[in-house]
Amino acid sequence: MVIDMYPAHILESGEIQTVREHCRSTAELAARALRPIGLTQSAYLAGLLHDLGKCKEEFRQYLEAAARGDEAIRGSVNHTFAAVRYILEHWHHSGGEFDDSDVTAELLAFASGAHHGLFDCIGVHQDSGFFHRQTKEGIGYEESVQNHLKECVDAATLDSLFQQSVREISAVIERITQLTAQESDEEANREITFHIGLLARLLLSAVIEGDRRD
């Protein structure tokens, strides 16, 4: 079911902020935050997708119930998994050589999917936090994607933004690699992995800043 203007927030005054308004504003604020270090498009894309999972009737009903003062358990309607699944299904390779596009997809999936709480990409038992989010049922994924692409941004624009993000992330990885050029392979790999972890937190921080400020 496709209905225009899905709500992202309903204020105490009754004013509605739509998912389109909120995602675009969050994206702009996140992009502005990371513009000085050349990650504008990466931050923009993560912000644009972070609330993809709100574009469904179940979330509309949840927000409207809360606005009326009805009993509505905060966080009871999952909206954070959808962006992770979309990003990984469309831009992450399921097999073969792991390259910068895969790194970019995982960074964006984490930044968009962890804006309400961190999750382990790899758990203590080697389980994947990404896989859990990709395979979770009953979250209205197809409905959310259909409505988000109609209301917020089309698929071709998302694909273009992702390719620009890959170029940005590749440039950062190249700079990190240059900094470790004098290290042994083992030490260099450790340093690169550490700095990519910092990059993940930086992108997430930009999305959270945009989300909270908007």
Regions found by a protein language model. Name each.
Residues 2-214:
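Accessory nucleic-acid engagement/destabilization modules that flank
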